[in-house]
């Protein structure tokens, strides 16, 4: 009841019909003058502007390194601020507080090497009534060069940014509307997914509900695996095994030929790549026949590279390090771009600027490099073997999702992470379900997009047009505030005409007549 009355008071405060819109806009525009309110948080407001209506082409931070402009979709107060984290480091952040603010905050993560403010989801979160918060994670752009010989900027990226932007953002909300958010949420994918679990492990009081998409957990092995995968296709030696887009189209068609119908229907989607025992040997050219043009078969070197790609990675002493690349990833354009004879940029930068030094010769890259990455593991960026007990005890909830066709982070990694948490906590799946659920999204690539029904409100670019579909932001709020957990995630196709229920792990998606249903392994 207390929260309901507080939210009602906030809505009255911000409702133009009650004559308070002018007060809100005045308070917003003068917020930068309230320096003393944020001194203890080392926070300086650099600009605060009230937007009475939607606006296009709004200047963004770091326009030459990230996006030049952004869009504001609802009336709101845009506050830009800097948090000093040391004598040589700082986080640049923004919080957008809409006039229809609901008393909830939404902190946002980032992607890749994470130096760009997520404006798309600032707009999305604020449009749904959240005070939306995002930062540049302590550096601008996607390069890892700022990490070189600077442990403070590295610490901002790994551990401090989400925590600090959230604390500062909540303080700004309190200064503007009179009280801190009644509920706090987080949403991020990829690096943002890793940040989600890092927050749950290390700062369990920050958030009531967390959405973690395709998390880049097991970070060192993930980036390390990409370096090794690239080496199979000539990135560190020669280009004899590079496969062009036409060749990857051949590979994709063979994958579908061998594995599409494993889920009971031929629809161009491999529902679960781990269930596909893909045999690239079927594509090898007969003795003495080259690949030719158009590509009709692959060379022995190319098939060998594929066999390595689709097998797990093991350490120097035979220990398991990381899953294979995702067999269910079939987009030939994406695959030809990824495995083009060049080292994956995040891997290259991490090795050069954090692990080995800028003069490292990648011809020396190998499993031993991955083991060095694991040994270094600054600030435990691996984010794999943590403890969710404090987050669970405080009543926190987690929705994790992962595209089954993800070409960047294998969905097998999310299963391994989930099972590691079950082991750490000593819980069975039905017990984990009480606070933590993992959903595997058939056909979806990295975070959004792909084939089939992959839109469920996980991102500002993936808002479903069919009202029968799920919205994962609504789902996490409903779980935290009403105790109603999602049994499935219902995704919608881009045109909204097709829906599909995506299952929570360890259930599996199985065709039952004309519809997919979720079933446990013993029932399949």
Predicted features and spans:
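Catalytic-loop region of hydrolases
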Residues: 14-102, 119-120, 265-266, 270, ...
């Amino acid at each position: 009841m207390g929260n309901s009355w507080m939210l009602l008071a906030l809505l009255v405060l911000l409702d133009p019909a009650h004559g308070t819109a002018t007060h809100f806009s005045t308070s917003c525009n003068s917020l930068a003058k309230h320096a003393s309110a944020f001194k203890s948080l080392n926070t300086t407001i650099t600009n605060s502007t009230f937007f009475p209506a939607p606006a296009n082409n709004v200047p963004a931070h770091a326009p030459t390194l990230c996006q030049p402009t952004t869009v504001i979709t609802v009336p709101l107060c845009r506050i830009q601020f800097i948090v000093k984290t040391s004598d040589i480091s700082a986080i640049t952040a923004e919080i957008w507080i809409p006039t229809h603010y609901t008393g909830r905050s939404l902190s946002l993560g980032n992607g890749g090497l994470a130096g760009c403010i997520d404006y798309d989801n600032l707009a999305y979160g604020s449009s749904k009534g959240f005070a939306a918060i995002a930062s540049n994670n302590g550096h601008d752009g996607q390069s890892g060069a700022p990490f070189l010989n600077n442990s403070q900027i590295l610490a901002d990226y790994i551990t401090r940014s989400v925590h600090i932007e959230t604390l500062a953002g909540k303080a700004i909300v309190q200064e503007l509307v009179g009280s801190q958010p009644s509920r706090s949420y987080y949403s991020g994918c990829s690096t943002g997914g890793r940040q989600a679990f890092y927050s749950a492990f290390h700062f369990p009081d920050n958030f009531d509900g967390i959405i973690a998409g395709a998390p880049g957990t097991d970070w060192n092995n993930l980036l390390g695996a990409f370096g090794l995968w690239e080496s199979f296709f000539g990135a560190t030696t020669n280009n004899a095994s590079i496969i062009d887009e036409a060749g990857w189209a051949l590979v994709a068609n063979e994958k579908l030929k061998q594995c599409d119908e494993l889920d009971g229907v031929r629809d161009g989607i491999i529902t679960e790549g781990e269930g596909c025992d893909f045999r690239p040997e079927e594509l090898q050219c007969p003795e003495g026949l080259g690949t030719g043009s158009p590509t009709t078969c692959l060379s022995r070197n190319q098939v060998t590279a594929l066999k390595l790609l689709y097998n797990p990675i093991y350490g120097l002493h035979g220990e398991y390090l990381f899953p294979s690349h995702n067999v269910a990833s079939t987009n030939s354009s994406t695959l030809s771009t990824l495995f083009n004879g060049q080292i994956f940029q995040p891997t290259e930068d991490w090795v050069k600027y954090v692990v080995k030094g800028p003069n490292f010769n990648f011809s020396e890259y190998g499993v031993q490099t991955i083991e060095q990455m694991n040994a270094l593991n600054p600030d435990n960026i691996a984010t794999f073997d943590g403890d969710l007990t404090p987050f669970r005890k405080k009543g926190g909830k987690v929705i994790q999702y992962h595209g089954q066709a993800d070409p960047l982070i294998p969905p097998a990694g999310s299963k391994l992470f989930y099972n590691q948490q079950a082991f750490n906590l000593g819980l069975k799946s039905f017990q984990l379900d009480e606070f933590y659920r993992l959903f595997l999204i058939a056909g979806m690539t990295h975070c959004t997009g792909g084939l089939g029904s992959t839109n469920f409100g996980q991102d500002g670019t993936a808002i479903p047009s069919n009202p029968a579909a799920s919205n994962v932001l609504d789902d996490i709020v409903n779980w935290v505030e009403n105790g109603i957990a999602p049994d499935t995630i219902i995704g919608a196709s881009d045109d909204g005409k097709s829906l599909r229920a995506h299952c929570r792990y360890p259930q599996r998606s199985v065709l039952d007549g004309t519809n997919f249903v979720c079933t446990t392994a013993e029932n399949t």
